[in-house]
Every structure is written in structure tokens, then in C-alpha cells.
């Protein structure tokens, strides 16, 4: 399923404890490209099985899922 992910400030924030940004963790978990457009969006291809986990990240405020 092709989607557009918009990255929020919360995902891009670097924690003070030295742990990776949530952006880095999401990119690694789902195998997304590290490309981000000037508008803060990344085009992605998500497997149906991974969609519920991606929705959890959206509910926590790290991303917005956009259908374009």
C-alpha cells in the first residue's frame, strides 16, 4: 500500500539521553527510505501486515499518514 508519511516534530526530536530519534527507529523498523521532502514527507510502500504498527506510531503523534 503506497502512502505518504508526514514526520512530526516529536519524531525528529533528539532525546537528551542519547537514544535514537523516533524517526530513525521507525525508518529502521519498517525499512523506509531516509528521504524527507522539503515539506517533511516521505513516500512509502507499507505491507498490510505492518499497517497496524504504523497506525500506533500515528496515534502516539510521531507521524501523520496521508493518502495522496
Model-based region annotation:
Residues 1-37:
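N-terminal acidic leader/helix
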Residues 38-42:
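Short, solvent-exposed S/T- and G/P-enriched segments that are highly enriched in secreted/extracellular
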Residues 44-68:
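Short, mixed-charge low-complexity intrinsically disordered segments
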Amino acid at each position: 500500500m503506497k502512502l505518504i508519511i508526514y514526520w512530526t516534530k516529536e519524531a525528529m526530536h533528539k532525546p537528551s539521553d542519547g537514544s535514537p530519534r523516533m524517526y530513525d527507529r521507525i525508518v529502521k523498523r519498517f525499512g523506509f527510505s531516509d528521504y524527507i521532502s522539503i515539506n517533511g514527507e516521505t513516500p512509502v510502500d507499507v505491507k498490510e501486515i505492518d499497517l497496524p504498527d504504523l497506525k500506533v506510531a500515528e496515534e502516539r503523534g510521531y507521524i501523520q499518514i496521508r493518502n495522496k
